[in-house]
C-alpha cells in the first residue's frame, strides 16, 4: 500500500486526469429518493482501518468513539506477507507483526473487547510469488497457514492487498493463473465464519467469481471516491472512499464524500495509516456525513512499545 501511495504522489497529474473520468464529486445534498440517515445502525456502514504496525500501536484505533461504540469496526494489522521459498508458499510475519500476535492479550484482545474485529493484513514480499501465481499445492499450503494463524491468534479474519509480489521473479510464473480466486475459496472453506476483505489492487479484479466469499472490497485510491464497485461487489459490500489518515483531507471534504457514501447505499469506508496523534477532526467529518453523528477522541495515545 505504501507502494501505491508513492505511485500516486509521483504521478499526480496522471491521477488527476483519471480521477476526472472515474470520480463523481460529492455534493452537499441528499438524493431526493433517499431517506434521511439518522443513526449509525440505519446505514450499516463499516469503518475499516489499515494500521502500519511497524510504526503504530494498533490500540490507537480504540481511542475514537461514536454513538457510545468504537468508531472503527475493523482494524487490519498491516501486514504479514506471502513469501515464496523454493517450491513453498509461506506465511511470513516480520518481528513487529509477530510480537503483536504473540502478545495478543495486550495488543489485540483490548480492541476485540470493545467490539472491533481485528484482521491480519496479507501482502506480497518481493519474492516473485504472490496470491495470483500459485499452483494448486501452493494455494492449499498458504491457505492452511493463514487459517491456522487466524485460529492460533484469535483473529477475526484477513485482508488481501496484492502489492509487492513482483510476479515472475526467481523463476516463479507471471500473475493471473487463477490462484487468487482459488485461494479465497480455499480460505473461506477453512474458516467460513471469519471475515475476508480485499483491497482493489493488482489482480483483485479476478475475484469476481468468488466475491460472495468476500465481506468487503476497498477502493484503492486515497482521498477520492469512485461510485463503481470492483470485482463485481454489490454496493452494500464496497468501500468507495478511502482516506489516507497520514495525509488526510479536510473535515468538510470528508463529510461531503461520506454523505454520498451513505446516500448511495455503500457498505463501508476505508482508512489507511492511522497515526498515534489525534485525528478526530476528519473522523468527525465522516461521522457527520455518513452517520449524522459525532466522533470523539478519548485522549488515549498509545506509543509503539514493541
Regions found by a protein language model. Name each.
Residues 1-32:
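Bacterial Sec-dependent N-terminal signal peptides
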Amino acid at each position: 500500500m505504501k507502494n501505491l501511495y508513492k505511485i500516486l504522489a509521483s504521478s499526480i497529474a496522471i491521477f488527476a486526469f483519471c480521477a476526472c473520468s472515474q470520480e463523481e464529486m460529492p455534493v452537499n445534498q441528499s438524493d431526493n429518493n433517499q431517506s434521511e440517515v439518522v443513526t449509525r445502525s440505519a446505514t450499516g456502514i463499516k469503518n475499516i482501518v489499515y494500521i502500519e504496525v511497524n510504526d503504530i500501536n494498533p490500540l490507537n484505533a480504540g481511542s475514537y468513539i461514536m454513538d457510545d461504540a468504537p468508531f472503527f469496526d475493523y482494524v487490519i494489522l498491516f501486514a504479514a506477507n506471502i513469501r515464496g521459498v523454493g517450491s513453498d508458499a509461506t506465511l511470513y510475519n516480520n518481528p513487529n507483526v509477530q510480537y503483536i500476535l504473540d502478545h495478543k492479550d495486550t495488543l489485540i484482545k483490548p480492541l476485540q473487547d470493545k467490539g472491533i474485529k481485528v484482521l491480519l493484513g496479507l501482502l506480497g514480499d518481493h519474492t516473485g510469488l504472490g496470491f495470483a501465481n500459485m499452483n494448486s499445492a501452493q494455494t492449499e499450503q498458504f491457505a492452511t497457514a493463514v487459517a491456522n494463524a487466524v485460529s492460533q491468534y484469535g483473529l477475526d479474519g484477513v485482508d488481501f492487498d496484492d502489492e509487492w509480489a513482483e510476479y515472475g521473479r526467481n523463476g516463479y510464473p507471471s500473475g493471473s493463473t487463477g490462484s487468487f480466486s482459488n485461494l479465497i475459496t480455499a480460505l473461506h472453506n477453512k474458516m467460513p465464519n471469519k471475515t475476508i476483505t480485499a483491497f482493489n489492487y493488482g489482480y483483485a479484479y479476478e475475484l469476481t467469481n468468488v466475491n460472495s466469499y468476500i465481506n468487503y472490497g476497498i477502493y484503492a485510491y486515497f482521498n477520492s471516491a469512485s461510485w463503481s464497485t470492483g470485482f463485481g461487489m454489490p454496493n452494500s459490500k464496497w468501500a468507495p472512499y478511502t482516506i489516507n489518515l497520514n495525509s488526510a483531507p479536510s473535515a468538510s471534504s470528508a463529510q461531503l464524500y461520506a454523505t454520498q457514501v451513505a446516500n448511495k447505499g455503500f457498505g463501508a469506508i476505508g482508512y489507511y495509516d492511522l497515526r498515534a496523534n489525534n485525528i478526530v477532526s476528519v473522523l468527525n467529518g465522516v461521522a457527520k456525513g455518513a452517520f449524522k453523528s459525532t466522533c470523539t477522541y478519548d485522549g488515549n495515545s498509545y506509543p509503539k512499545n514493541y
